[in-house]
């Protein structure tokens, strides 16, 4: 397929009031990403004090951490279908209330069971936001800036994680000797939940979703608020043509043809699952969830680890900012394949340093910290933003939220498994064995991405959809 065919038929994007309004919508919607980041990152510093107060062993720690990820898998899968039925905006408003009450449950949890319940509620909201917010942004964005606009959500995710690390360090070092200090760490996340709820009440629905459910006038009205009038009318017409082509395909599908229709969905779904699960297999959340444990294993004291843990969070934000600048300049495939190759390289360096540097070497924790920061920087620059953008772009409109939900489900399930297993693995084989394992897996994923990942940069969602359905978008078609 031609990546430029849509560019040649649509009027120029232009700038003005509509561009500023689109930016405001993106800012409000990405509060879901901020909550996603804070709620996944807060456990990093809260785990040690809550373990002491509630008498948690390593198994309980794994369940408190992993319960969010497993619930997020369910949230991602369920909210894809919910947003298809009720709309992206309505679903995000509902998620904001779950964020709020999940945080309150954690704040007032008297025991591990209630804490896991609160973390499960937060997980449902985190997973739902991870599936719905990127789709909402992708459906609002013009193709020229879709990567950078959709990628802002991941910037807010890592911004939320950094905020959690800073809050953890401040509260932990100033009031760490007091009971219940971890409750204040959780209490902070009620504030952006309120902001998301209030903000989304003033945000319009996705015009693509409105068209899919037959609300053309509303869709055109929304599109005119975020595009010039000429561009809005042209985009609406293009979306309608694609929907009509889909309807024709469905009506004509029978016998062998219906198997072919199912075949294109299975193929792109397998790619989406690879993208979603692969991100987690980088081992990034071994640092974002268990950074304090990893840094203590490297040789830092608990108070020093709380402060040192801010460094990976900071580089994650800087890497995401750089990634947003690269998204419209570098092909998605290049970003992803480079990302998995570079993370594998730093995995090997971390494992080597851990094995070769003796535990009593004063430089050991600092060398490992630098290598961990390099790993996080490479991953966040090349993979984190691009992963969520790609998953939001891959699927045709009528299965977009469901496909995104299943892809995110695979990622969150892998996240949950690693969250449960990592403390045990770290205790059994240390940093060396853990990161050698990650390195081997990431080399394999890089090869799979090279063979199977489509290129979606610089192409409208409707053009991607046509390429997915006729197979021309894949590397094997000779386009890349």
What spans do the regions from the language model cover?
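Alpha-helical transmembrane bundle of multi-pass membrane proteins
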Residues: 1-218, 224, 247-480
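Short intracellular "coupling" helices and adjacent cytoplasmic loop segments at the cytosolic face
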Residues: 225-235
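A short, aromatic/hydrophobic, helix- or strand-capping loop or linear motif
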Residues: 234-238, 418
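Short Cys/His-rich micro-motifs in 6-15 aa windows
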Residues: 243
